[in-house]
Amino acid sequence: IAAGSLGGMSAMHEQTRGLNYIHHINQPHWFAAGGEEDREEFGVRIARELEAKRDELGEDKVAAFIAEPVQGAGGVIVPPDSYWPEIRRICEERDILLIMDEVICGFGRTGNWFGCETYDLKPDLMTFAKAVTNGYIPLGGVMVGNKVADVLLNHGGEFAHGLTYSGHPVACAAGLATLNILRDSKVIEHASSNIAPHFQARLAELRDHRIVGEVRGLGMFAAVELVRDKSSRERLAPDSQAAVFCRDTANDNGLMVRQTGDAMIMAPPLICNTAEIDILVDKLGEALDQTAAHYGVG
């Protein structure tokens, strides 16, 4: 219930009814909500909602702010450059703990080992999972910064964080093996320097497609937002039907993509080569052509 309440997926909130002590501010999704507003001004304005929410609730009611560096399942929402510096300022000035959810961004997805490094952030707590074992064995964890650890260890006794399967030797062995491969083979550095730039450049070519409203991405993941009209950002079809059609068409053509809302999401393996990236983008382009034809957009 707590995890569902923390996330931004409304279906989960409806299912669990949510927890009344968890509050949300708007996401820094400029394409969806920015209108004609300058992108960087939008980023600052949305970040300052944290400050306003803290004042609304009272300083003794706000323990922490938790977010992904880049929202993954929400649609690869890359925040404006102004967003995270303003969040960092607010957290530091208002003594709000910063918790980074690195489950998706962690271990190379944004071009660095962790997304917080990409945005020059030093979180007080950081969650991780997924790529720590390359997905072969379930493993997740929480990294605790000195600010929190010092209080727990020096003023509260033991750091009681054990769970039934904590430190499972098989899972931890898989994690260590994965980390060794990432480090010794320089997988992240190679992807960041050689593959990610090609991936983002090829996807950028789709911006001129007649049903593409926005192409956004960072490192080795990206999203393509579908629209009927580029100027008004009118959706191609209600209830994300067009995006579902595009996803299914891409799958039929041999390309696996994820659909979230009206966005097509891609997160190729870090070990891809440029030829495979070309296949990905070409197949997505074909799916976009078929989707445009299906909905009569010439």
List the predicted regions and their residue ranges.
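Conserved N-terminal phosphate-binding loop of PLP-dependent enzymes in the Aspartate aminotransferase
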Residues: 1-298
